[in-house]
Amino acid sequence: MFTLKKSLLLLFFLGTINLSLCEQERNADEEERRDDSDKRDVEVEKRFLSTLLNVASKVVPTLFCKITKKC
């Protein structure tokens, strides 16, 4: 009976440690996800600005040509 209690106590202790480690890992993952959304916003902003610059580089010369009528 004593050895059974000892074994159960050991299993309970190891399970508690395991759950604690999983919780810490889960918290770290949540923090990473929060940081990732900021990085994604920056990446989207960079893509948007580069697309806008590409369009502007094609449209501005055409507009300048039509306004000055020196085509």
Curated annotation (Swiss-Prot):
Keyword Hydrolase set for record: no
Top-level lineage group: Eukaryota
Keyword annotations of the record: Amphibian defense peptide, Antibiotic, Antimicrobial, Cleavage on pair of basic residues, Cytolysis, Disulfide bond, Fungicide, Hemolysis, Secreted, Signal
One of the Pfam families matching this protein, by short name: Antimicrobial_1
Localization of this protein: Secreted
Described function: Antimicrobial peptide active against a variety of Gram-positive and some Gram-negative bacterial strains. Has antifungal activity against C.albicans ATCC 10231 and a slime mold isolate. Has hemolytic activity against human erythrocytes.
Name of the protein in question: Brevinin-1CG4
Organism: Amolops chunganensis
